[in-house]
Amino acid sequence: MLTWLQRNSLTFPPLEKAMRDPNGLLAAGGDLSADRLIQAYRHGCFPWFSEGQPILWWSPDPRTVLFPDELHVSRSLGKLMRKQRYRVTFDQDFDAVIRACAAPREYADGTWITEAMQDAYIELHRRGFAHSVEVWDEGELVGGLYGLAMGQLFFGESMFSRADNASKYGFATLVQHLREAGFVLIDCQMPTDHLHSLGARAISRQTFADYLARHLDQPNHATWVC
């Protein structure tokens, strides 16, 4: 039975209570307050829903992740990076990145990054949890992504691209930055061909929970202004 969250409580049900079909649906309801979102990521779940649906919280099994040392850079992407085809910054325009990620896609009917979701993550950015990666081509924002950094873990949320390999360029740059800063895992949530091409793979929900327990409260050395 699906658990409905109460607005006056930040408690989530145990991860093993998540449904098998649909895979990983853990709870519904609650709100998108910054405190609840922080608790959700610490617990091992994330919000994902469409306009008109209640807030849905997920913890899929298996979980798609990328270990920084396993980043795969294709020949074409490596060529672009060696040429420094784009300029990459961090936290220079979080609002623009999340708006671009929320924009309609040709292959989708709508967006799960609702206005309420955008406002929630902008607040997390103000609090220092959410960060953006911007990819620039001569002053034009052509790609980027955003997510949360907590301890030695980074929780990726969404990315966009308006130019050849721009989102992969930004993601690869981020992974290199995180590796140097002592991060051990990047949560990619759900599997996609795009992420698998970069080296992402599946681990069990329990293994993911073990990483949370060991690394959420460990220090990292990341700087986010460049």
Swiss-Prot record:
GO terms for cellular component: cytoplasm. Its EC number is 2.3.2.6. The keyword Cytoplasm applies. GO terms for biological process: protein catabolic process. InterPro entries: Acyl_CoA_acyltransferase, Leu/Phe-tRNA_Trfase, Leu/Phe-tRNA_Trfase_C, Leu/Phe-tRNA_Trfase_N. GO terms for molecular function: leucyl-tRNA--protein transferase activity. Pfam families: Leu_Phe_trans. It catalyses: N-terminal L-lysyl-[protein] + L-leucyl-tRNA(Leu) = N-terminal L-leucyl-L-lysyl-[protein] + tRNA(Leu) + H(+); N-terminal L-arginyl-[protein] + L-leucyl-tRNA(Leu) = N-terminal L-leucyl-L-arginyl-[protein] + tRNA(Leu) + H(+); L-phenylalanyl-tRNA(Phe) + an N-terminal L-alpha-aminoacyl-[protein] = an N-terminal L-phenylalanyl-L-alpha-aminoacyl-[protein] + tRNA(Phe). The keyword Nuclease does not apply. It comes from the Bacteria. Keywords: Acyltransferase, Cytoplasm, Transferase. It is found in: Cytoplasm. PANTHER family: LEUCYL/PHENYLALANYL-TRNA--PROTEIN TRANSFERASE, LEUCYL_PHENYLALANYL-TRNA--PROTEIN TRANSFERASE. Belongs to the L/F-transferase family. Functions in the N-end rule pathway of protein degradation where it conjugates Leu, Phe and, less efficiently, Met from aminoacyl-tRNAs to the N-termini of proteins containing an N-terminal arginine or lysine. This is Leucyl/phenylalanyl-tRNA--protein transferase. It comes from Pseudomonas fluorescens (strain Pf0-1).
